[in-house]
Amino acid sequence: MLTIKQIRDDKEAAARKLAKKGVDAAPVIEKIISFDDRRKALQLELDNTLAAQNKAAKEIGALMGQGRREEAEERKRFVADLKEKSSRLEAELTDARQELQSAIVSLPNFPAEIVPEGKTAEDNLVVKLVESYTALPENPLPHWELARKYDIIDFDLGVKLTGAGFPVYKGKGARLQRALINYFLDCNTRAGYLEVEPPVMVNEASGFGTGQLPDKEGQMYHATADNFYLVPTAEVPVTNIYRDVILEKEDFPVKMTAYTPCFRREAGSYGKDVRGLNRLHQFDKVEIVQLSLPEKSYEALDGMVAHVESIVKALGLPYRILRLCGGDMSFTSALTYDFEVYSEAQKRWLEVSSVSNFESFQANRLKLRYRDEEKKIQLAHTLNGSSLALPRIVAALLENYQTPEGIRIPEALIPYTGFDIIK
């Protein structure tokens, strides 16, 4: 959530920044300033009314002590009128704050200066390309055919048990999943991230804190009886560990990693791009989260990008890194880098990680703050990234490591799988 100061300091600049995300924010900004002016005026009137009420209440006792009962009764009536007025003002102030809050939360985060202009994924900037292609057999198979051939992932059984987008991993397919999760977590903990195991259901406050609510409720599975949401990413529960927390400057950086199954409705997804593991309703993902001092957050982002790259590189997959354009960025992000691995069998790039700096946007919603050197309370910065998302990594491994003998396992994973080939 943007702060009032960010909007009021230069409303024209705020509108220009949000236009980069494809948002015509000028009308909303004018409403926000108007709502804020009303809130300030009501707050001032309420403060003055309460001050007059307190002063008059004190005068009643003095008048009674002097035997001036008639004047004291008059002051009592005056205080009663002020109490009625203050109650009315408090109700109006509550409404004004809610109007202001609703308007502010409708605006996305400002994009960073280096975010490219653009509206769609076609406008994203390729900042690195590593073409470590493996030699594939003639007419390589896509992963969904390999999964059927080696009986390691059963998509039809998932449909029987739940529905489309809920595959069942079997035998070496299940062991490969478990191996990847453990490998990713080990890579992250070796890099200084604290492993946590959070709940996979969160409340509304947690969804609001990281920006999934009210923006993405249509994409989340909602347990209406308890008003809980299944997590679309471990970012939500892990970042919310520090909701309503004030840290000391020396506590930074805070680095956490977690594995969770993730749940996304993906409403409206259809066509060839959703075949097999390309787009699922339930999938496994390992996440990294950092809390940073504002002046250190872009340095932290660079470190997270380098860390994710080291994992992708160790798997020996062809990959590229993209800097997302304004129109393709998330509601909450200030700057995002996507990692994609190449599928030779599908002839397309598959996203396997998204690493983002949210600056103070999430922290403002979370009330995640710290004390600076002068003991003033400031907003922290939050960052997170997939390290990594499993479905498309599994798809890329199956497709890029297929041979006439079977599917080879990258050397880095063999200690985790206990086997070097699927056949």
Tell what function each PLM region has:
Residues 1-134, 148, 152, 156:
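N-terminal alpha-helical targeting/anchoring segments
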Residues 26, 129-423:
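TRNA-recognition modules of translation machinery and tRNA-sensing kinases, especially anticodon-binding
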